[in-house]
Swiss-Prot record:
The RNAP catalytic core consists of 2 alpha, 1 beta, 1 beta' and 1 omega subunit. When a sigma factor is associated with the core the holoenzyme is formed, which can initiate transcription. Coiled coil: none annotated. Zn(2+) 1 binds at C60, C62, C75, C78. It comes from Clostridium botulinum (strain Alaska E43 / Type E3). The gene is rpoC. This is DNA-directed RNA polymerase subunit beta'. Its EC number is 2.7.7.6. Mg(2+) binds at D450, D452, D454.
Length: 1177
């Protein structure tokens, strides 16, 4: 049997008039919609029941047939078929036009397809279509030229001169249709190919464009005449509804207005033609019909848009598809779903990591069908109907059944904005009183949630498969690591950190110091009986099983540390157990801060896996909350002690500033130097004040404890509270040289307060803009990477890339070890000292092996990379390496493209927006933060361009009064000279040796220049390290592989330069594998291969250049993408994720991949019996 959703590809094309008539159930002849008295549709109107089907289920228009039993009968009185009203969503009608009109997409798009095909300019075409000029269709014997334009006067003169029937000229779409019908596509393509060989410059570009359109029509089987419309399809009435409002008025979709205008003008034109009206009147009516159809298809594309009440432009068919509110993004890519709810969240410190609290009434509504089924199964209710009644009346026995139903049925919690995949996680629900969802405190970081009124949505996975996926892949206890860098995301925060810090502190001279206890329990008992203090240094005998023998030893520790270590595995590697002295020590024998907790979790995950780690995390959470309550840390004004040394430091700074001012006034230093020295001095003074403050604070000072543990606040905030606020930035981003001397404890004066608010407002405005920009960047990244999925185990390539540490100046931004962990080698790695092979080729490098490689002194390693992967679509598991979220090798079917896009986009909001101004020097305003990342991914020419050397060689600098020039002398004697513009800073000095592609002046490099000089590999390396620099400077870690995936997608296309004997067109962009395939075909027959160069496309261009027209159309420029796809008759192979979501199939990733499709799931009750239960409408 043919299944509707079982297809492999989807094709788009132009519709012929015959096809449109075939779709239609009848012709719409009248502009009427609904009779205002009877509220029934008018016959032959836009809502006609005869054409589109009945308004009410199983009921004809006149009421002769009512009820299901007449199903399928066509009423003999009113001609309406008795069927479901739902058919009004699918049945189409049509309008027969009295005169053909052109389709605005093909005439007006850029480039104009109609214009290219006929070799006419769009302006000339417009004159003909809108009845301003005649066009010669057949000159016959006259000296007129074919396709020559004649205005009214010239036409009259020609008719007078040559006679009435001596030539044929026409106007409007009819004339164009006739000319389009005469075009011979095959001959035209041949002729254009001949011309292409001789032409150059602009002419060549135009020929290539024309050839592309001609070949598209020839190959796709579209007839050029179909760009002119004779029949207009009318979409089903329920997709353009008309609803009655309270006051008896009607609200209608804009499309009805647009259709009405078309029908009115069409009918008027028919009348005029029947009456044989004068030519000029008919022509005017035809022009108006053309404009009405234009407005229906794409309102506002040409001339002023048709407006409705209140001067609002009407939404045309094109607008229905476009933009965020269009069909693609609103209804196809994201739908509202049943079995979901939302509520405010509150903290649930008593929950386990895999649990969430679900309000009772919400749970009952969400699990209603399950509860009803269970009630019937248990015999509490006799049938579904009575079960439904029980649930609706909320009888007491319903709650017991609900408890049973939700055990082992995970739910998904989601918080908007979902910036990465941890924004949706699965939890085991626990019923709670009240109306708020309870969330585990450790899940907050992943969701970026807090409890100041945030809301979250709950979704119920229905099928057994969905439940299994939620339980195994999405349970919060398993998502401990961040997919972007593989570090733990569930690190305890705030109170939990403070409690752990308090617990592991020690205080000299505390009560009971130096006492000795026979075991842990005795020590804890002494603490609980208030004999000793929790922070006192004591001696305890601890017992350990070593090689099956119980041994003991005395260690020096505190009760707090003993309690803390009870919940921590004692083999995490923080203590060297081989050492006799350390054999019995506690694993965590240091002061625990947020940072060290991260390391503890990391180690635990690597050694014990997620399950044990999540148990440990729950224990740390419980301890943290308990002991931060016992510690009772508070904050008071008296805790902020201003260091007495501050005033001396300020006085000393003032004196230095005076000296600098004097030097400047005497002309020893320039304005820039003075400014920089003043800023430097104040920065240093502020630091000194802050250091003095930190030294003077007691270790048990609550503010110090909070900052030091990482629970809340930081050194810089304490500096502002009790030290001095220091330098502030002005809204332009320039640092003001007037520092704020006071701290908040002392209080700011009016000027200081004003200066500090000045810069702060800029920060707030930036944050608001940043969110939108960052979201848009994520959307483009997702679009360009969405079809990158791990498709196979090993692509078998021998290629790879060399990696070494990334440096910015002398500072190491990313270490080599970090770049090696979780990657496969592309060649044997040999120890340079001993000559032994450390790692063989194609081997996996875990942290231990990576350590070995780095400690052998190797600086450069060749690894497998997504860049060099030979997979036709997606990447292979070996080129990708480790899955950052699980710290294991990646599985086939993982959607690594989406993960990469999310990993880069999610921290986007943390990046800065501003351009830093370093003084007033030209050319040194380098873009940083989010704009810089965008500039790189869009492969734009950057602001503040650096001059780049094109050859290897030695530098010679020449300075004259007028200009500076740099000469690079190559090895083969060739010399390149570069003029240095005023104000640029040189990066090289006289006599330096530089490589091709190195910067001569400071600034950013245009990635396209690097592509030309160093090739694709150089450009890829440059983009990767530049993006890494931006993120690392903001303290964000992103693994290289995510950037590799994106940059790979940017360099996938080849620009064809010469076509050789292939079918490729010069100047077109084509996928690199298609290019190689076309050449391989030609090679078999010994023909001439095509030549091309790899291109670097920005992410927007790369996303639009995808093979899938559905994916591209749902991204941006919808009409342009669909116009092109229709003319080419494109076939969408449905390879990526978006296109499959759009047509409603399972996505080809994860368990949706073909290789996993056949799996059968067994639930606990071995056999699933599908008892047919009656469904109550």
């Amino acid at each position: 049997m043919f299944e509707l959703n079982n297809f492999d590809a989807i094709q788009i094309g132009l519709a012929s008039p015959e096809q449109i008539r075939e779709w239609s159930r009848g012709e719409v002849k009248k502009p009427e919609t609904i009779n205002y008295r009877t509220l029934k549709p008018e016959k032959d109107g836009l809502f006609c029941e005869r054409i589109f089907g009945p308004m009410k289920d199983w009921e004809c228009h006149c009421g002769k047939y009512k009820r299901v039993r007449y199903k399928g009968i066509v009423c003999d009185r009113c001609g309406v078929e008795v069927t479901k009203a739902k058919v009004r969503r699918e049945r189409m009608g049509h309008i027969e036009l009295a005169a053909p009109v052109s389709h605005i997409w093909y005439f007006k798009g850029i480039p104009s397809r109609m214009g290219l095909l006929m070799d006419m300019s769009p302006r000339a075409l417009e004159k003909v279509l809108y009845f301003a000029s005649y066009i010669v269709i057949d000159p016959k014997e006259t000296p007129l030229l074919k396709k020559q334009l004649l205005n009214e006067k010239e036409y009259r003169e020609a008719v007078d001169k040559y006679g009435d029937d001596s030539f044929v000229a026409g106007m409007g779409a009819e004339a164009i249709q006739e000319l389009l019908g005469e075009i011979d596509l095959v001959a035209g393509a041949k002729e254009l190919k001949e011309d292409l060989k001789q032409s150059t410059g602009q002419k060549r570009v135009r020929i290539i464009r024309r050839l592309e359109v001609v070949e598209s029509f020839a190959k796709s089987g579209n007839d050029p005449k179909w760009m002119i419309i004779n029949v207009i399809p009318v979409i089903p009435p329920d997709l353009r509804p008309m609803v009655q409002l309270d006051g008896g008025r009607f609200a209608t979709s804009d499309l009805n207005d647009l259709y009405r205008r078309v029908i009115n003008r069409n009918n008027r034109l028919k009348k005029l033609l029947d009456l044989g009206a004068p030519d000029i009147i008919v022509r005017n009516e035809k022009r108006m019909l053309q404009e009405a159809v234009d407005a229906l298809i794409d309102n506002g594309r040409r001339g002023r848009p048709v407006t409705g009440p209140g001067n609002r432009p009407l939404k045309s068919l094109s607008d229905m598809l476009k933009g965020k509110q269009g069909r693609f993004r609103q209804n196809l890519l994201g739908k509202r779903v049943d079995y979901s709810g939302r509520s405010v969240i509150v903290v649930g410190p008593e929950l386990k990591m895999y649990q969430c609290g679900l309000p009772k009434e919400m749970a009952l509504e969400l699990f209603k069908p399950f509860v009803m089924k269970k009630l019937v199964q248990d015999g509490v209710a006799h049938n579904i109907k009575s079960a439904k009644r029980m649930v609706e009346r909320v009888l007491p026995q319903v709650w017991d059944v609900l408890e049973e139903v939700i055990t082992d049925h995970p739910v998904l919690l989601n918080r908007a904005p979902t910036l990465h995949r941890l924004g949706i996680q699965a939890f085991q629900p626990v019923l709670v009183e009240g109306r708020a969802i309870k969330l585990h405190p450790l899940a907050c970081t992943a969701y970026n949630a807090d409890f100041d009124g945030d809301q979250m949505a709950v979704h119920v996975p229905l099928s057994v498969e969905a439940q299994a996926e939620a339980r195994f892949l999405m349970l919060a206890a398993g998502n401990i690591l961040k997919p972007s860098d593989g570090k733990p995301v569930c690190v305890p925060t705030q109170d939990m950190v403070l409690g752990s810090y308090y617990l592991t502190m020690d205080r000299t001279g505390a009560k009971g110091e130096g006492m000795t206890f026979s075991n842990k329990d005795e020590a804890v008992m002494a603490y609980e009986s208030k004999y000793i203090d929790i922070h006192a240094q004591i001696n305890v005998r601890v017992y350990k099983e070593i090689d099956g023998v119980l041994k003991s030893g005395i260690i020096k520790t505190t009760v707090g540390k003993l309690i803390f270590n009870e919940s921590i595995p004692q083999d995490l590697g923080f203590v060297n157990r081989e050492d006799e002295k350390e054999k019995f020590n506690l694993e965590i024998d240091f002061l625990v801060t947020k940072k060290s907790l991260g390391k503890v979790i990391d180690q635990s995950y690597m050694l014990h896996g997620p399950t044990k780690t999540s148990i440990m995390l729950d224990n740390i959470k419980a301890l943290g909350y308990h002991y931060s309550s016992i510690g009772a840390v508070t904050v008071a004004a008296s805790d902020m002690i201003v260091p007495p040394v501050k005033y001396d430091l300020l006085h000393e700074a003032d004196e230095t500033i005076d000296k600098i001012e004097k030097m400047y006034k005497r002309g020893f230093i320039s304005e820039d130097e003075r400014y920089e020295r003043v800023i430097e001095k104040w920065t240093k003074t502020t630091e000194e004040v802050a250091d003095a403050l930190m030294d003077s604070l007691d270790k048990f000072n609550p503010i110090y404890m909070m900052a030091d543990s990482g629970a809340r606040g930081s050194k810089s905030q304490i500096k502002q509270l009790a030290g001095m606020r220091g330098l502030m930035a002005s809204p332009s981003g320039k640092i003001l040289e007037l520092p704020i001397r006071a701290s908040f404890r002392e209080g700011l004066d009016v000027l200081e307060y004003f200066i500090s608010t000045h810069g702060a407002r800029k920060g707030n405005a930036d944050t608001a803009l940043k969110t939108a920009d960052s979201g848009y960047l994520t959307r483009r990244l997702v679009d360009v990477c969405q079809d990158v999925i791990v498709r196979e185990e090993d692509c078998g390539t021998d290629d790879g890339i060399y990696v070494s540490e990334i440096k910015e100046g002398s500072e190491v931004i990313e270490e080599l070890k970090e770049r090696l962990i979780g990657r496969y080698t592309a060649e044997d790695i040999v120890n340079p000292n001993s000559g032994d092979i450390i790692v063989a080729k194609n081997e996996y490098m875990d942290p231990v092996i990576a350590d070995k490689v780095v400690s052998a002194g190797i600086k450069k390693v060749k690894i497998r990379s997504a860049f060099t992967c030979d997979c036709k679509v997606g990447v292979c598991a070996k080129c990708y390496g480790m899955n950052m979220a699980t710290a294991k090798k990646i599985d086939i079917g993982e959607a690594v493209g989406i993960i990469a896009a999310q990993s880069i986009g999610e921290p986007g909001t943390q990046l800065t927006m501003r351009t830093f101004h370093t003084g007033g020097v030209a050319g040194s305003d380098i873009t940083q933060g989010l704009p810089r990342v965008e500039e790189l991914f869009e492969a734009r020419k950057p602001k503040g361009l650096a001059i780049v050397s094109e050859i290897h060689g030695n530098v010679r600098i020449e300075e004259t009064k007028k200009k500076r020039a740099v000469f690079v002398m190559g090895a083969d004697g060739e010399e390149c000279s570069y003029d240095i513009p005023f104000g640029s800073r040189l990066k090289v000095s006289d006599g330096d040796y530089i490589e091709a592609g190195d910067e001569i002046t400071e600034g950013s490099v245009n990635p396209h220049d690097i592509m030309n000089i160093k090739g694709v590999d150089g450009a890829r390396r440059y983009l990767l390290s530049e993006v890494q620099k931006v993120y690392r400077l903001q303290g964000v870690d992103i693994n290289d592989k995510h950037l590799e995936v994106v940059v790979k997608q940017m360099t996938r296309k080849v620009k064809v330069l010469e076509s050789g004997d292939t079918e490729l067109l010069p100047g077109t962009m084509i996928d690199i594998f298609d290019f190689q395939g076309a050449n391989a075909k030609v090679r078999e027959f010994g023909g001439e291969e095509a030549k091309g160069e790899q291109s670097l496309l920005g992410i927007t261009k790369a996303a639009l250049a995808t093979d899938s027209f559905l994916s591209a159309a749902s991204f941006q420029e919808t009409t342009r993408v669909l116009t092109e796809a229709a003319i080419k008759g494109k076939v969408d192979p449905l390879i990526g994720l978006k296109e499959n979501v759009i047509i409603g199939k399972l996505i080809p990733a994860g368990t949706g991949m073909m290789r996993y499709r056949g799996l059968n799931l067994n639930t606990k009750n071995e056999k699933i019996e599908d008892n047919e239960t009656e469904i109550v409408e």
